[in-house]
Amino acid sequence: MKLLSGLLLCSLVLGVSSQRWFSFIGEATQGAWDMWRAYSDMREANYINADKYFHARGNYDAAQRGPGGVWAAKVISDAREDLQRLMGHGAEDSMADQAANEWGRSGKDPNHFRPKGLPDKY
């Protein structure tokens, strides 16, 4: 746990560079909330073939917050995919999820992954 905390702190320090700390931390917090909201919506929707859309949407929304949001989205996405791989989920699906994550983080429209019939609420 100490190692993970240390790596997270180092990643934060390196990610900030000359950014103002409070701005970066605020963006990261809001970005993490955006990721949580997309995950919650995915669970609520429980819609077949919609996971890539929610991955892209969460990363997109977080990245719109600024560099802190991009950092939070990358850390959360990478940690989630690493955990999925450790639990034995397929590497192909993980790679597809990461592609959707990167798509959203780069500012591209997450609706590219939106499945037909997904309620407008999402």
Curated annotation (Swiss-Prot):
Protein localization: Secreted
Any Pfam family: SAA
Signal peptide: 1-19
Skewed-composition ranges (Basic and acidic residues): 105-122
GO cellular component terms, semicolon-separated: high-density lipoprotein particle
InterPro entries in UniProt: Serum_amyloid_A, Synovial_Prolif_Regulator
PROSITE patterns the record matches: SAA (PS00992)
Tissue: Detected in liver.
Ranges where the record places region Important for amyloid formation: 20-45
Chain segments carrying region Disordered: 87-122
Listed GO biological process terms: acute-phase response
Domain of life: Eukaryota
Keywords: Acute phase, Amyloid, HDL, Heparin-binding, Secreted, Signal
Family statement drawn from the similarity comment of this UniProt entry: Belongs to the SAA family.
Quaternary structure note: Homohexamer; dimer of trimers. Can form amyloid fibrils after partial proteolysis; the native, undenatured protein does not form amyloid fibrils (in vitro). Apolipoprotein of the HDL complex. Binds to heparin.
Function of the protein: Major acute phase protein.
Name by which UniProt lists this protein: Serum amyloid A-1 protein
Source organism per UniProt: Oryctolagus cuniculus
Gene designation per UniProt: SAA1
